[in-house]
Regions:
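N-terminal single-pass transmembrane signal-anchor helix
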Residues: 1-37, 41
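Membrane-proximal N-terminal amphipathic helix
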Residues: 37-63
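Phosphate-binding glycine-rich loops and adjacent basic patches that engage nucleotide phosphates
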Residues: 7-16, 54-64
Length: 157
């Protein structure tokens, strides 16, 4: 009789079962795409806020109002943007007018001299962007934050 070289049906089934178990265990670690996309969107909004803030500051410097505690500048489309020490004010008349963000993100005033941008459907611990207005001793800043239990954007610890 001739000896056959190869795998039996039982051996193939066992290998397939083992591969299935490994795939179910390892796949979630590699398929965290939704959270990656949300983090990337927040980083994009952060970059837009920072860029808009710098562009408005440049415009304020050209108009000579960068040292004023309260002024306004006109954008290219004749929108008036409120500025504080040259940077957009942390309000809907300031940074919210300076930056253009699609409808999947909302904006709101937070604590004094802060303004936040968050996804419309944001849940607790979701990424958000927190804009802090300029003061006489510090420029405006924008940082990534997290939605807290009160559904407000706060700096990440």
């Amino acid at each position: 009789m001739k000896k056959q070289a190869g795998f039996t049906l039982i051996e193939l089934v066992i290998v397939i079962i083992i591969l299935g178990i490994l795939a179910v265990t390892a796949a979630p670690k590699f398929l965290n795409l939704q959270n990656d996309a949300k983090t990337a969107a927040a980083s994009g909004v952060l970059a837009a806020v920072q860029s808009s803030s710098q562009l408005v500051y440049s415009k304020a410097a050209l108009e000579g109002v960068e040292a004023s505690p309260s002024a306004s500048v006109s954008s290219a489309d004749n929108t008036t943007i409120a500025v504080v020490y040259g940077y957009p004010k942390a309000s809907k008349d300031g940074i919210a007018k300076a930056v253009t963000i699609d409808g999947s993100w909302s904006s709101a005033s937070s604590a004094s001299e802060t303004y936040s941008f968050a996804p419309v459907d944001a849940k607790e611990k979701a990424d958000c962007v927190l804009y802090k207005g300029a003061t006489d001793s510090a420029p405006a800043t924008a940082v990534l934050g997290k939605i807290n239990a009160s559904k407000e954007c706060a700096e990440a610890p």
